[in-house]
């Protein structure tokens, strides 16, 4: 918690700046908000309270506001929430709650909603971010004259997420490692592609990977594991700590961050 607390401002600032640059062609611009729950807190409840507090600022004459709201713009503002780390399944609730609060723009308040019932464009189905990143990857591979099937890759963000699942489904490379919320999956000869596709389609973490499909050199270390001996003989005393730094230790031709660890690309890798 203390580590994340120390890096929270820098992480949020960098994400907000990136979002603003990405949204340079639309009038609303871009921003980012982060929520750091206390240990043991319910993330869903934290998100709900966060949304409620933002709606307090956006909806005129909201009851319960104890002090006058400082308005530096002088006009009504509209914000749009998009799904990010751990909030993809909360977008429906955000829109529905805005409707209950009487917001006239409730339907556009969140993106990535269930399209069949609330409309909008589903991020995962259209693979918005992943398709953009894929173009960069194809450009690099073509420039270097490589064959994608021979390129090794480490990926952060697992098959349960929007980006991670689409990256698996759209790629043909030799993925040697995937690091997600549940742990680390590694196979130096390439993780079984069929099993990865299965997890991606079912949107499940690597904790559900069939380890019988790993080679003798492959392994899976989950965050709750303790004192695990790897095929190399190395002993992992703490699976949680190993998960947090694995992306800095594993080697591959290509590193594709699909969420996961903050500041996963830095001067050391």
What positions do the PLM features span?
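Active-site loops and adjacent core secondary-structure elements that bind or stabilize anionic groups
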Residues: 1
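Structured mid-domain segments that build the active-site/substrate or prosthetic-cofactor binding neighborhood
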Residues: 6, 12, 248-269
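Glycine/serine-rich phosphate-binding loop and adjoining beta1-alpha1 elements at the start
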Residues: 12, 16-149
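Beta-sheet entry/capping signal
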Residues: 32-34, 77-79, 152-153, 174-177, ...
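Short acidic, glycine/serine/threonine-rich loops at helix termini
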Residues: 46, 89-96, 164-169, 187-193, ...
């Amino acid at each position: 918690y203390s580590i994340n607390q120390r890096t929270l401002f820098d992480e949020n600032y960098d994400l907000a700046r990136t979002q603003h640059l990405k949204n340079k062609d639309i009038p609303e611009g871009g921003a980012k908000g982060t929520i750091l729950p206390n240990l043991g807190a319910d993330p869903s409840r934290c998100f709900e309270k966060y949304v409620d507090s933002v709606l307090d600022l956006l909806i005129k004459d909201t009851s319960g506001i104890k002090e006058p709201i400082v308005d530096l713009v002088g006009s009504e503002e509209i914000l749009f929430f998009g799904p990010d780390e751990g909030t993809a399944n909360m977008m429906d609730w955000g829109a529905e709650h805005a409707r209950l609060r009487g917001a006239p723009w409730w339907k556009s308040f969140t993106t990535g909603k269930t399209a069949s019932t609330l409309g909008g464009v589903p991020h995962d189905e259209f693979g918005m971010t992943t398709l953009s990143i894929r173009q960069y990857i194809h450009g690099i591979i073509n420039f270097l004259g490589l064959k994608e099937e021979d390129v090794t890759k480490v990926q952060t963000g697992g098959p349960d997420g929007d980006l991670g699942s689409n990256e698996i489904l759209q790629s043909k490379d030799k993925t040697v490692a995937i690091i997600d919320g549940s742990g680390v999956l590694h196979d130096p000869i390439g993780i079984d592609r069929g099993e990865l596709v299965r997890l991606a389609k079912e949107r499940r973490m690597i904790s559900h990977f069939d380890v019988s499909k790993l080679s003798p050199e492959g392994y899976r270390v989950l965050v709750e594991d303790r004192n695990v001996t790897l095929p190399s003989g190395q002993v992992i005393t703490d699976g949680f700590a190993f998960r947090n730094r694995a992306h800095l230790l594993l080697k591959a031709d290509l590193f594709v961050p699909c969420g996961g660890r903050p500041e996963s690309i830095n001067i050391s890798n």
